[in-house]
């Protein structure tokens, strides 16, 4: 990787032992190995993601070329492979399309209001009034409902 030989590693180990001491050296080695593993895994995931994106781009380019040439009289094997490529491309883009679109019918169904029964409130001094139950708030002092 860095073109470091065995003797260079021995020298680095001896210098680390002298500088850090025998108590802190194992912790430093564990920390360094953890960071190296983390960097390697990140690099591998980025590499795999780039390869996947390049493959998808190649698939899209091949599909565009096939559509531009309008190849209708291809062999059955090529027709089948083109259909597989189309379905693969659609399955890749389908989750993104579903996240961005909102279906109005389902959104309206979720916000359906339920009917509210009115509550009548009467106090000794006033005439009875009727207020909707959704706006009524109980009073903690008297146990009655106030608008």
Swiss-Prot record:
Annotated stretches, region: Disordered: 114-147
Main location: membrane
InterPro entries cross-referenced by the UniProt entry: TatA/B/E, TatB
Keyword rRNA-binding attached: no
Molecular function in Gene Ontology: protein transmembrane transporter activity
GO cellular component, as recorded: TAT protein transport complex
Bilayer topology: Single-pass membrane protein
Transmembrane regions: 1-21
Residues of the signal peptide: none
UniProt keywords, alphabetically: Cell inner membrane, Cell membrane, Membrane, Protein transport, Translocation, Transmembrane, Transmembrane helix, Transport
Record-level GO BP terms: protein transport by the Tat complex
Superkingdom per UniProt: Bacteria
Subcellular localization, as worded in the UniProt entry: Cell inner membrane
Function: Part of the twin-arginine translocation (Tat) system that transports large folded proteins containing a characteristic twin-arginine motif in their signal peptide across membranes. Together with TatC, TatB is part of a receptor directly interacting with Tat signal peptides. TatB may form an oligomeric binding site that transiently accommodates folded Tat precursor proteins before their translocation.
Family to which this protein belongs: Belongs to the TatB family.
Subunit structure as annotated in this protein's UniProt entry: The Tat system comprises two distinct complexes: a TatABC complex, containing multiple copies of TatA, TatB and TatC subunits, and a separate TatA complex, containing only TatA subunits. Substrates initially bind to the TatABC complex, which probably triggers association of the separate TatA complex to form the active translocon.
Protein name: Sec-independent protein translocase protein TatB
Organism: Aeromonas hydrophila subsp. hydrophila (strain ATCC 7966 / DSM 30187 / BCRC 13018 / CCUG 14551 / JCM 1027 / KCTC 2358 / NCIMB 9240 / NCTC 8049)
